[in-house]
Every structure is written in structure tokens, then in C-alpha cells.
Amino acid sequence: MASNVTNKTDPRSMNSRVFIGNLNTLVVKKSDVEAIFSKYGKIVGCSVHKGFAFVQYVNERNARAAVAGEDGRMIAGQVLDINLAAEPKVNRGKAGVKRSAAEMYGSVTEHPSPSPLLSSSFDLDYDFQRDYYDRMYSYPARVPPPPPIARAVVPSKRQRVSGNTSRRGKSGFNSKSGQRGSSKSGKLKGDDLQAIKKELTQIKQKVDSLLENLEKIEKEQSKQAVEMKNDKSEEEQSSSSVKKDETNVKMESEGGADDSAEEGDLLDDDDNEDRGDDQLELIKDDEKEAEEGEDDRDSANGEDDS
């Protein structure tokens, strides 16, 4: 169900508001009004008063369609008097102008008319409400700008205009002012769109710069990772070469020890051989001396025998 707010005074709301007069509010309720007028567009507000009602649409096109489709329709034995709230009809709200269903369509048997007292009081109340509506929602025409001071204003005789013509001119001016207001709101919307577009462009530039910074950071990180990997491989190669050098040094030291041991063994063998030769010579000398001693003994014994 729509809200009860139908008293906004901005031009857009006024141009999209429908006034429903000569409404039998004793029978017709707010839900009935919404059901009848919702087929012309979305209803954002609906208020039902004694003898009349207001329906607030989203835009002026829906309101004009509702006025064209429902004006003069008979509901609950009464003919509706419908128009835009910003464009009141000429001579409305005057006593004796309203037409009942019996006047337009003859006697209506299925909907008996109320008692004379009730009918007269209802008409008076309706007239009062319509006059109140005229006073509340009559918008004075815009005052034109004053003429320049330098130019003299020459009074001109104008023909007197009738009240009907003035009301028509006034209503026409109101519709024109509504159109100006709508064009102004369209211009404001265009300015808002331009501002939004500018903000979006700035946001896009910021996002692009952030993306560029992220790409630079990623490149630097990948470069640092490659450098760290190269340094690590160089360290591994240097450590492996150091280990290899240490292994070679160790092997060389072990080989030198083996050579020295072999040389020592060879020297020991030479010493042993020299010692063996000396012992053999000593043995030979001893044997030679022993033989010479025996020869001396033999010679001595031979002399004794002779």
C-alpha cells in the first residue's frame, strides 16, 4: 500500500499528482482508489479526504494518462472530476456546476441517491474542500524582472480580460513553469552525471597507477629472487670447490706420508744390507784368522817332529 504523503510542493511532485474530485468517500476507500489508478503507473502516495482524494505518481506521464482515462468516470453513483494538481480546471469548486449521475445518465435505480439533507451537506462540504484546495495549491505566476531604470515605462491600455481567460493563462503558465522545472532538473541531472563521470575517471587513473606500482613491485621481487638464486648457486659452487681443494690437500698429505714411510723402509733395508755385509766380512775375517792359526800350528808341529 502506498504512503499517505501527497502534499509535496516541488514542481515535479505537483506535475505528477492527480486530484480526484466528487468522490463518494463514504463508499470508496483508499485501497479502492489505489486499485483503480495503479494501472496507469506506480503510485508512491495516496490520501483520501472527505469528498476528494489525491494520487501521487512517479512521473507526469502516468498522471496525465490517469486523468485522460478516469476523468468523468462514475464510481459509487458519482461522476469523478479528475485533473492534475498543478493544472486546476476552470470554474471548479463553484456551487451548482457539479453534475450528478442522475443528470448525466438519467435515473440510476441500482444506486439510490442519498437523502436530500445528506446530499446537500455533502455538496457543501465538497465545495468547501475544493475552495480550500484552490487556496492551498494555487501558485502565483512568476513576477517578471523589472524593466531597466534607463528606459521609461509607457503605460498602455489593455483590454480587460475575463476571469476564465486569466485562469487559463495562469494554468498554462503553471504548466510551462513545470516544464521549465523539469528541464532544470534534467540539466541538474546532466551536471551530476558529468561530476560522476569525472570522479570515475579519477578513480580509474588511481587504479591504473596502483596497478603499475604493483607490476613494478612484482618485477623487483622477481629480480631479487633471481639474484638470490644466483648468489646461492655461486655460494654452493664455491663451497664445493673449497671442499674439493680440501680433499685434494688431504689426499696429497696422505700420499706424502706413504712416500716417506716407503723411503724409511728402503733406508732400513739398506741399513740391514750394510749390516749383513759387515757381519759377513767379520765372519770371513774370523774364518781366515782361524785358518791361519791352524796353519801356524801345523807348521809348529812339523818342526817339532823333525
Swiss-Prot record:
Region (Disordered): 139-190, 221-306
Residues the record lists as Phosphoserine modifications: 113, 115, 121, 162, 166, 233, 238-239, 241, 253, 260, 299, 306
Protein name: Heterogeneous nuclear ribonucleoproteins C1/C2
Annotated crosslink Glycyl lysine isopeptide (Lys-Gly) (interchain with G-Cter in SUMO1) location: 232
Residues recorded as bearing N6-acetyllysine in the entry: 176
Biological classification of the source: Eukaryota, Metazoa, Chordata, Craniata, Vertebrata
UniProt KW rRNA-binding keyword: no
GO molecular-function terms, A-Z: identical protein binding; mRNA 3'-UTR binding; N6-methyladenosine-containing RNA reader activity; nucleosomal DNA binding; poly(U) RNA binding; RNA binding; telomerase RNA binding
PANTHER family membership: HETEROGENEOUS NUCLEAR RIBONUCLEOPROTEIN (PTHR13968), HETEROGENEOUS NUCLEAR RIBONUCLEOPROTEINS C1_C2 (PTHR13968:SF3)
Short sequence motif Nuclear localization signal: positions: 155-161
GO CC annotation: actin cytoskeleton; catalytic step 2 spliceosome; chromatin; cytosol; extracellular exosome; extracellular region; membrane; nucleoplasm
Modified residues (Phosphothreonine): 109
Keyword annotations of the record: Acetylation, Coiled coil, Disease variant, Intellectual disability, Isopeptide bond, mRNA processing, mRNA splicing, Nucleus, Phosphoprotein, Ribonucleoprotein, RNA-binding, Spliceosome, Ubl conjugation
Compositional bias ranges of the Acidic residues kind: 255-276, 288-306
Domain RRM: 16-87
Position of the Glycyl lysine isopeptide (Lys-Gly) (interchain with G-Cter in SUMO2) cross-link: 8, 50, 89, 94, 176, 223, 229, 232, 243-244, 250
Cross-link Glycyl lysine isopeptide (Lys-Gly) (interchain with G-Cter in SUMO), where in sequence: 250
Location of N-acetylalanine modifications: 2
Mutagenesis / variant outcome for changing residue 197 to R: No effect on sumoylation
Residues in coiled coil: 190-238
Processing and modification events after translation: Phosphorylated on Ser-260 and Ser-299 in resting cells. Phosphorylated on Ser-253 and on 1 serine residue in the poly-Ser stretch at position 238 in response to hydrogen peroxide.
Pathology noted in the entry: Intellectual developmental disorder, autosomal dominant 74: An autosomal dominant disorder characterized by global developmental delay, including delay of motor skills and speech delay, intellectual disability, behavioral abnormalities, and subtle facial dysmorphology.
